[in-house]
Amino acid sequence: MKYSFIIPVYNRPDEVDELLDSLTRQTIRDFEVVVVEDGSSIPCKDVVDNYADRLSIHYYNKENSGPGQTRNYGVERANGEYMLILDSDCILPENYLKEVEAELQYKKADAFGGPDRAHESFTDVQKAINYAMTSFFTTGGIRGGKKKLDKFYPRSFNMGIRKEVYQALGGFSKMR
């Protein structure tokens, strides 16, 4: 298996549903999904179970330890060569893996990240928050969505990393 999507989640079953739905639309299917519930009081297990017939999906529920440790927990259980780490509120375009695959064939990268932008269905408030987070006038220098190979500034809501590199680096910090 080439790719493992690692999805830490805390009290977001509706967003997990949207993300998993977007994964069913991927044009490349060589992936598994690892959903790790981080001690949620509003679990997403029923949502995950609804996708068991359409995705190679694994669900884990553990005590709350924060997003970094939850990502590490997921990576430990994943089988892919590349770990694609997403936040639970991501929605991927159907060509996401196709573009990742093309870039990895062109440039052999051990780690990579992608831009973020507001989905067209977002409310005006959500779009304003997105602007504040991605504008050149705020943090756009880091999160500005440039499409070029450059220094890697990890943003854990949309990042990929070769599993062996992740393990060599020790994963995410134990800090909360």
What are these regions (language model features)?
Residues 83:
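Short aromatic/hydrophobic "clamp" motif used to bind/position activated sugar donors
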Residues 118, 141-164, 173-176:
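A recurrent flexible, glycine/aromatic-enriched loop bordering the glycosyltransferase active site
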Residues 87-91:
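The conserved acidic donor/metal-binding loop of glycosyltransferases
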Residues 20-61:
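Acidic donor-binding segment of Leloir-type glycosyltransferases
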Residues 62-78, 99, 153-157:
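Glycine-rich, basic loop-to-helix element that forms the pyrophosphate-binding segment
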